[in-house]
A protein has these predicted regions:
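Donor nucleotide-activated moiety binding/catalytic core segment of transferases
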Residues: 36, 225-276, 280-281
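C-terminal amphipathic helix plus adjacent low-complexity
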Residues: 317-416
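Short active-site oxyanion
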Residues: 100-105, 221, 264-266
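A generic structural motif
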Residues: 1, 27-32, 217-222
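Conserved catalytic-core segment of nucleotide-activated headgroup transferases in glycan assembly
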Residues: 142-238
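Short, conserved active-site loop motifs that form the nucleotide-linked donor/cofactor pocket
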Residues: 103, 126, 247-250, 305
Length: 416
């Protein structure tokens, strides 16, 4: 194995991982994909490069060390969260610490690069390439995603009706006890409490708007697409009940957000950065703000955007396409996504950089505090007691096979 790609959320990252995998395999590399923390027997040989979706600090390195008998020397952090509020920046969230700071860091734009440099990360570890997710919004991928007809048949969505989409991001509204404790420790109890209150009130009012809308407009289909983290929260049951109560309300978490953005007539967001995909696809997206979000907690390019704060405006924007102006100014988005709108594929530029990192010794780093054998003995003893030395489940995942097939077909036929 030359390269080990680790992903967290299936819907957000797996297509990206397979796209990189098959491009690298075309170039002659052996690539393996897995989720973090998947129980497996440590491999004897370490890969030439480990690619991470995030890299916070020492605890991530500990998880990586127990996977290999021999030392790994190179890590690339894809940084799947790069646009965040000042609150998260102030606590250094998603900024690598300890020895993780020595990893290569992929930046979507120069704004993120400056933030990391200000945090003390060396410029020679930073590369500005762009967000790979933007590739899927380019014309070459027009046949990559599910068609409206496919979604209509699978989810009983009348094709002749107009479809409204809400891209939810209420992962902080009803966190688990362990998540709440982690948030309290990370951003402080006062900030945690205030952000939780804003999230709960906003979600409650937006759901009231949506329920009133589907009740008043039975020929409009409304799709609630949750954030992956919301599938674990207590509001899950409430959304399921709404799905059962109204024939035109659909609580659907299957498929990527791009599948839904492409096929819906009206799109709504609260604070999701997926609004950037709407921008690239030239789809107008409404920003719903029944409760004011303090600038300290808000996504930077949402602050000066056009917001909807009352039900009547929400209703009008989901029944009429008269307003076709995007709510966020181009320059606000461009500050964080340097390559937005460019025709060149970002995944190919990422693979070009990966080859540079693999082939240059200057990117070698020591990520160990102890020897790898000691770390792996601890791992094996712990897992034997837990009974967790299980077969890697990735190879048996239906969705993984679908992603793999789609990406393989695209990479091997593109430009052929």
């Amino acid at each position: 194995m030359d390269i080990h790609i680790i992903y967290e959320h299936v819907e957000r990252e797996l297509y990206n991982a397979f796209l990189i995998k098959f491009e690298l395999e075309k170039r002659g590399y052996d690539v393996f994909i897995s989720k973090p923390h998947e129980a497996r027997i440590p491999s004897f040989n370490a890969p030439k490069l480990i690619i991470m979706p995030w890299l916070f600090g020492e605890h991530n390195l500990v998880d990586l060390r127990v996977g290999y008998i021999r030392r790994f020397k190179k890590i690339l952090n894809l940084q799947y969260e790069q646009v965040m509020s000042q609150m998260w920046l102030d606590v250094g969230y998603h900024i690598s610490s300890d020895k993780a700071r020595n990893a290569c860091q992929l930046c979507w734009g120069n704004k993120r690069k400056r933030i990391l440099m200000d945090a003390g990360i060396s410029e020679d570890k930073l590369v500005v390439i762009g967000d790979i997710r933007q590739d899927f919004s380019k014309p070459a991928f027009k046949n990559f995603f599910k068609t409206r007809n496919h979604l209509s048949n699978e989810f009983n969505l009348p094709e002749e009706h107009e479809w409204c989409l809400f891209i939810s991001s209420f992962s902080f509204a009803t966190p688990s006890e362990s998540s709440r404790q982690y948030i309290d420790e990370t951003i402080g109890i006062e900030n945690s409490k205030k952000w939780n209150e804003i999230s709960i009130k906003s979600q409650k009012l937006i759901l009231e708007w949506i329920e009133q809308f589907v009740r008043e407009n039975p020929n409009q289909e409304f799709i609630y697409r949750p954030h992956p983290s919301e599938l674990k929260d207590t509001n899950y049951l409430h959304l399921q009940k709404l799905d059962e109560k109204y024939a035109n309300f659909h609580f659907i978490f299957k498929y990527s957000v791009q599948d839904w953005i492409l096929n819906c007539d009206y799109i709504n967001s609260w604070i999701s950065t997926s609004i950037v995909e709407c921008y690239v696809l030239k789809k107008v997206c409404n920003i719903l703000r029944p409760v004011k979000v303090d600038e300290y907690f808000d996504i930077p390019f949402y602050i000066n955007a056009d917001h909807i704060s009352d039900y009547e405006s929400f209703k009008e924007r989901n029944l009429s396409k008269k307003n076709n102006k995007f709510p966020i100014a181009h320059n606000e988005i461009k500050e964080y996504y340097d390559d937005i709108g460019e025709e060149e594929f970002i995944y190919k530029k990422i693979c070009d950089y990966i080859e540079v990192v693999i082939n240059e010794d200057s990117f070698n780093e020591d990520y160990y505090n102890h020897g790898p054998i000691i770390d792996n003995l601890k791992f094996l003893i712990g897992k034997l007691f837990e009974g967790m030395l299980l077969e890697n489940s990735l190879r048996h995942s239906t969705f993984c096979r679908v992603c793999s097939s789609a990406c393989s077909t695209f990479v091997h036929t593109e430009n052929s």
